[in-house]
Amino acid sequence: MALTDYKTALVTGASSGIGEATVRALSERGIQVYAAARRKEKLDILAAETGCTPVVLDVKAKNAIYSTLNDLEIDILVNNAGLGKGFEALFKANPDDIQTTLETNVIGAAHVIRAVGAGMVKRNRGHLVNIGSVAGLYPINSSVYGSSKGAIHSMSQNLRIELKGTRIRVTEICPGRVATNFFNIAVDDPEKSAKAFEGFEALTSEDISDAIMYAVDAPWRVNIGTIELSPTEQTFGGMEINPAPE
């Protein structure tokens, strides 16, 4: 079941970055895309340029998710909406940032899957694409954000088991550092945000949308479970040993 077998897609977090690039890529391939995000003005511009259908939606609003999405027949879900508030150590993090990060990245993602996935199961066709992160695979010194993406990793793997015997595929995309507005929002400090990209060439949003297209366009017999992408100069898994206090 390659892209040519699909007709519709829903992309959350579609107003910029990875979401916007994915809307453009799917639209170019003839897919009718529902582009969901909070910023109506950005969606209207994207709709004018791509022909997508704008859907104003905050994934923290549970009731709005179901009332808006329940009746849509979606073949491809790109579960992209997310943010990175709460990068401080957990015991220093702003309680509101903890709440917002987990509500958006985990609870919102789960409700979107529930709202759209039930129809996929009924029609016995579809592809769930969850945008995770290398932060969900490796410890990156961020308990809140890392655990939110770790939950997406676990959710994606468990969905594969729950959907066994159906024609519904599940893919998790795990990017490293991507040149989007993510860090500007995460740290709320332009200088710190700029430093996050010093010394290496970051991934682009199009790199991620290309990976999504690769997974979705695979023959039906192929389920690409996880794609991990990182800048060539970004690595993970180093060990640090701190000396014992004297």
Give, region by region, the residue ranges found by the protein language model.
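Conserved glycine-rich cofactor-binding loop
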Residues: S15-S16
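Active-site loop-to-helix junction immediately N-terminal to the catalytic Tyr of the SDR YXXXK motif
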Residues: A93, P139-S147, N158
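Residue(s) in the substrate-gating loop at a strand-loop-helix junction
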Residues: S133
